[in-house]
């Protein structure tokens, strides 16, 4: 046994925890030393971190930090040995180490060489090992296993605090003034776990060949070339780890005509199966298969086959088990469901041909009336237009059957989405992304021609709006309680705007759309954690009121930050004519206080940097890193095991103690109507949407689930995500974690 080395490790524990807390731990440590008298430090650290995890339970939740401290000691010892320095000097040499890693192709050379050696040395001095004490064991292990830089032998060459600094350095390398201070501010925000960036940024910032955006949405054109071009674009994004939403509502239905030949089309299902194959085969260098959500309108003739795509029975030739599905629902359909009236299904190609318009290209501008229901009724009344008739409630039953068996389809409430779209002057929003929180203008990229010029094949396509999501989230339980929102949010908005400039997207129309709208998605996580710390029950008016007040504050600070950034960098190119410019964004939401009027005036006069600003993603994996609860979701259990393919780690609810335990009620026992009320309160302050899950028992009756959907629609939810039943396991999009 190396007494000196163990003394250092033990001394750190004694400084961080009381003797009473570690009484059982020291007893187990003594037993280990007796059994391994020649045991080395690394073996002791490994063995005792496992013992600490075994001691973790609801009465002793602090053992996750004991295990994290021991694991962190192992990491520092390993990296210090590699760098040939003492553990206490491991961060001091990071500036020189960064140059070596860039020379080896492990860091992006353009990032490192954009800073002088003097600047690298200064930034290295900011690295604060004590902030590792904020990590739970599962949080630290997740960060190390999945995100810190490793060499070509998969050995760790970067420590957690250095990952935070590299993200800050990467995202601010093109800043023209006060660059180091902006890097330092971003490092402060990240290392204190006040915020996280999206997982692609977390994983790829500062590394070669990595893209930084989270999710994408494509609109498929109704042509053979358009369908295959879209599939190729999806594949090119999927290989970099992006989660993708695909809107198929413009593609003609089964039995539609092709070039005048009747009953020639095979409909959307075969093309969705092609996307399913893409998701499975383009598997991100073997790490995990791609993630694609396909959306279809509820009036599309193929909707019933679409709803059966993920079912476990029936004709396998009509199944796509690896695709996630979403339905686009107008107000009129929900009204027909509630009234138990008939619903009509149409072929979008036939509607375009006979009616001279596309039904999907319009919506109800006002509740209860508008262009969509007028045109829908015209289609119903046109006897020349073929149509299928089915009770609306029967379609809803099919939806709910699929949801209870598979968790999907997601719901996209298209009328409310487009009524609240701040950029309706430039287009339509047809669907959402993989996690239902991103809602931005969309349009199909159209093939124009292929020619040979100078013995080179040249293909021309007219670019559509191919949506890109750039995400970051606030850790509510830390940032709100520490009172740092006013300092934090401008840092986040600047970082997100910088991602737009730095990102190297493989799809040109996506790059174009990103620059036209400069859309970002600032969100939150740790909501249940915050409620528990504030001693507020989930099922209470106090929780609803807090959601309203807090998200109005976050919205104000986010809009203010983007408006201030516009004064420095200019507005997004499509600002003129937007709700932002005209001031209707503020009046629609009843923002009439003095500070809101002043902000409205500022935006109208000097603009806003980002056309879309807020979105609440699922962010389950980054919430694990930050040691808090995911998104706006309640916890599953107070104690559970986080299972990955190669390990199983016990976890307790964050900051679980005799005071907070009473406020951690399991998701499956919470009245979901209170969840809807909370989200109605926050949704009015969020210009995009929220990944809103329903948690239900597998014994739920159809009428109860229907009541949830109807209330969500009536409360002006823009979307709902999974229906999570106790009988099914579901997978979140890692890319949307932020």
Locate the predicted segments by residue:
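Conserved catalytic alpha/beta cores of large enzymes that bind or transform nucleotide phosphates
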Residues: 265-273, 280-393, 397, 401, ...
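Core nucleic-acid recognition elements
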Residues: 1-165, 181-187
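Alpha-helix capping and helix-loop boundary segments enriched in small/acidic/polar residues
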Residues: 4, 155-158, 177-181, 200-208, ...
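Terminal amphipathic helices with adjacent charged low-complexity linkers/tails
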Residues: 63-102, 141, 329, 417-448, ...
């Amino acid at each position: 046994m190396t007494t000196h080395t163990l003394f250092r490790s033990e001394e750190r524990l004694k400084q961080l925890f009381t003797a009473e807390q570690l009484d059982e731990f020291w007893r187990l440590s003594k037993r280990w030393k007796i059994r391994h008298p020649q045991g080395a430090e690394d073996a002791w650290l490994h063995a005792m971190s496992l013992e600490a995890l075994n001691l973790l339970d609801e009465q002793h939740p602090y053992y996750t930090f004991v295990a994290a401290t021991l694991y962190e000691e192992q990491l520092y010892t390993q990296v210090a040995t590699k760098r040939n320095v003492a553990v206490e000097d491991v961060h001091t040499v990071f500036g020189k180490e960064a140059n070596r890693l860039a020379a080896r192709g492990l860091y992006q050379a353009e990032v490192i060489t954009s800073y002088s050696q003097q600047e690298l040395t200064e930034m290295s001095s900011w690295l604060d090992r004590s902030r590792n004490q904020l990590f739970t064991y599962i949080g630290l292990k997740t960060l190390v296993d999945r995100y810190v830089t490793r060499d070509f032998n998969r050995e760790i060459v970067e420590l957690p605090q250095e990952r935070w600094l590299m993200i800050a350095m990467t995202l601010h390398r093109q800043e023209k003034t006060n660059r180091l201070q902006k890097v330092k501010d971003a490092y402060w925000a990240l290392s204190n776990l006040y915020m996280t960036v999206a997982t692609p940024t977390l994983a790829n910032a500062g590394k070669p060949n990595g893209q930084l955006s989270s999710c994408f949405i494509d609109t498929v054109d109704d042509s053979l070339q358009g369908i295959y071009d879209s599939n190729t674009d999806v594949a090119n994004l999927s290989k970099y780890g992006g989660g993708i939403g695909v809107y198929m509502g413009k593609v003609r239905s089964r039995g539609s005509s092709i070039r005048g030949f009747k009953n020639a089309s095979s409909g959307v299902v075969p093309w969705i199966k092609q996307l399913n194959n893409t998701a499975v085969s383009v598997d991100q260098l073997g790490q995990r298969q791609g993630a694609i959500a396909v959306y279809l309108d509820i009036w599309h003739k193929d909707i019933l086959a679409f709803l059966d795509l993920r079912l476990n029975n029936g004709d396998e030739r009509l199944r796509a088990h690896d695709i996630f599905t979403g339905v686009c629902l107008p107000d009129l359909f929900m009204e027909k469901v509630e009234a138990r009236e008939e619903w009509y299904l149409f072929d979008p190609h036939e509607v375009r041909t006979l009616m001279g318009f596309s039904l999907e290209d319009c919506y109800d501008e006002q509740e209860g009336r508008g262009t969509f229901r007028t045109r829908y009724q015209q289609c119903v009344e046109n006897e020349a237009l073929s149509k299928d008739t089915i009770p609306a409630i029967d379609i809803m039953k099919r939806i709910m059957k699929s949801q209870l068996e598979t968790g999907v389809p997601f719901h996209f409430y298209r009328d409310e989405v487009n009524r609240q779209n701040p950029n309706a002057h430039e287009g339509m929003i047809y669907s959402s992304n993989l996690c239902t929180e991103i809602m931005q203008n969309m349009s199909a990229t159209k093939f124009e021609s292929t020619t040979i010029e100078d013995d080179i094949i040249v293909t021309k396509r007219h670019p559509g709006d191919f949506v890109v999501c750039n995400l970051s989230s606030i850790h509510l339980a830390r940032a709100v309680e520490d009172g740092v929102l006013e300092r934090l949010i401008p840092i986040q908005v600047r970082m997100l705007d910088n991602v737009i400039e730095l990102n190297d997207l493989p799809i040109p129309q996506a790059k174009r759309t990103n620059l036209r709208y400069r859309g970002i998605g600032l969100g939150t996580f740790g909501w249940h954690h915050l409620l528990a710390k504030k001693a507020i029950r989930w099922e209470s008016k106090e929780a609803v009121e807090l959601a309203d007040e807090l998200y109005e504050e976050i919205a104000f600070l986010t809009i203010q930050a983007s408006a201030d950034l516009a004064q420095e960098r200019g507005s997004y190119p499509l600002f003129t004519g937007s709700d932002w410019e005209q001031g209707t964004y503020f009046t629609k939401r009843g923002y009439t206080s003095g500070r809101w009027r002043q902000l409205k005036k500022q935006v109208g006069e000097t603009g806003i940097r980002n056309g879309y600003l807020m979105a609440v993603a699922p962010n389950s994996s980054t919430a694990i890193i930050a040691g808090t609860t995911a998104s706006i979701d309640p916890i599953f259990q107070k104690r559970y095991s986080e299972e990955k393919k190669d390990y199983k780690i016990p976890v307790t609810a964050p900051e679980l103690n005799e005071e907070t335990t009473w406020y951690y009620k399991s998701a499956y026992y919470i009245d979901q109507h209170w969840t809807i009320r909370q989200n109605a309160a926050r949704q009015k302050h969020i210009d995009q949407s929220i990944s809103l899950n329903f948690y239900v028992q597998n014994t739920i009756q159809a009428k109860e689930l229907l009541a949830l959907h109807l209330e969500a629609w009536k409360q002006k939810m823009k979307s709902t995500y999974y229906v999570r039943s106790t009988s099914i396991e579901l997978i979140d999009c890692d890319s949307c974690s932020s």
